[in-house]
Amino acid sequence: MDQRTIGFIGSGRVTAFMIEGLFRAHTNLAITVMDANPAVSENLAQRITSVTNAGTNSKNVGKADFLFIALPPPNVQAGCESIAPFVGQHTIVVSLAPKASISALSNWLGTDKIARYIPNAATSIGEGYNPVAWGSSISESDRKLVRELLSVLGDMPEVDETNLETYAVLSAMGPTYLWPLLDEMITSGVRYGLTPDESARLVSRMAVASANMIEAPGKDYATRMDMIPSKPMADIEQDLRGLFRAKLDAIHAKLSN
């Protein structure tokens, strides 16, 4: 891939793991970041020394080959309107934010070359599950450029825009549902006598293999559970499911309205 310029408006956690993943796979990127709080973008540029900090200067960020909107939903409109005068005619905009539709982004930015992309943290190691939805006016050649840049970050299913908030709840936020449980298992392993490395390896391998079984032929939930004779959590499973379901429903409703 020829050298590409990339701008990020917003320099928080998502920007950081996106850049980490991009630099793992691409060596010819010129990345500039900006943030309404210049201390945030400066901190990121100090941690990732290949990144240029534009502070609050929108001009260079807006004219990049790829402009990533990496802002929390309440800040997206203001951020887009602030950078709109500087967006280049060639610039492809990729929004990482839930809630803000392609139609709204187009109105705020004054461009139709827009895609929405929902990354998750595994993007940082090239194993993300990151759906993309295309604006109706983005050309196939521009879509190819986006795929070329982002496919190295993990799976990139092309989905209907109306489903992106569901992906945000289940994929982007999904690790935060699992990691506390897995971390508690690792801690328990150490408490029972394993070394931290032994316990982490055990739990990691167990979790990966268990996840792989979800898509294995003939291994639906009931079949998988029936394979294990001892089920220590059976007496609280329905309570846990109820709490979990209520939380997921609340998050999804918040993002979808």
Feature roles, as predicted:
Residues M1-V61, G128, S188-Y192, I251-N257:
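NAD(P)+-binding Rossmann beta1-loop-alpha1 motif at the extreme N-terminus of oxidoreductases
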Residues R4, L29, V51, T91, ...:
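A structural micro-motif
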Residues L170:
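Conserved phosphate/anionic-ligand binding catalytic regions in large, soluble enzymes, centered on
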Residues M18-I19, M34, P38-A39, I48, ...:
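Rossmann-like NAD(P)(H) cofactor-binding subdomain of soluble oxidoreductases
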Residues D2, A200-N257:
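NAD(P)-dependent Rossmann-like dehydrogenase/reductase catalytic/cofactor-binding core
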